[in-house]
Design a protein with these regions (language model features):
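Amphipathic alpha-helical scaffolding segments comprising HEAT/armadillo-like alpha-solenoid repeats
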Residues: 1-5, 26-38, 60-71, 93-108, ...
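Alpha-solenoid helical repeat architecture
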Residues: 5-11, 25, 40-44, 55, ...
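Acidic-enriched, low-complexity/disordered segments with a strong bias for Aspartate over Glutamate
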Residues: 6, 14, 35, 42, ...
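Structural detector for internal amphipathic alpha-helices that build alpha-solenoid repeat scaffolds
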Residues: 12-26, 48-58, 78-94, 117-130
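N-terminal alpha-helical segment
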Residues: 13-14, 32, 47, 99
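Amphipathic alpha-helical interaction modules
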Residues: 34, 38-82
């Protein structure tokens, strides 16, 4: 593979680059994390579950991407749902705590779509689990 962009899945069935992604250094993987996180937007996609360990591998690099994904103006509430229910639980509690304000914002001041798509319920469940562990 000549370019990092070649490692980004081309479709929801494209798991051909998973091993190569796992071998990337943090600095290289960080460059494509915003593209990779989009592939967990539907957890029925074969690629989604395989990307979770890769996305969670370097928590300090994925935290800013998660924060951006959870912003109120981001319209992809299905992606928010899967980030909250599948990706964040795979981070250590130290990194989960870095996302507390973002999670509380969803709970206390959700957008209409965050309420409609059950993102709020997932945020409450996640917050309860984080607080239980700490």
């Amino acid at each position: 593979m000549s370019k990092l962009s070649d490692l980004v899945p081309k479709n929801k069935f494209d798991t051909s680059t998973i091993n190569s992604l796992m071998m990337l250094s943090e600095s290289k993987l960080a460059q494509i994390l915003p593209d990779l996180i989009l592939w967990i937007a539907d957890f029925n996609w074969p690629i989604a579950a395989e990307l979770i360990p890769i996305l969670a591998k370097y928590p300090s690099s994925i935290i800013p991407v998660i924060k951006e994904t959870l912003e109120v103006q981001q319209n992809d509430t299905i992606l928010k749902y899967w980030v909250i229910s599948k990706l964040i639980p795979n981070l250590s509690s130290v990194y989960q705590l870095m996302l507390i304000d973002d999670i509380k914002r969803i709970i206390l001041n959700p957008s209409n779509s965050e309420t409609d798509e059950e993102v709020v319920e997932q945020a409450i469940f996640l917050l309860e689990n984080i607080e239980m562990l700490n």
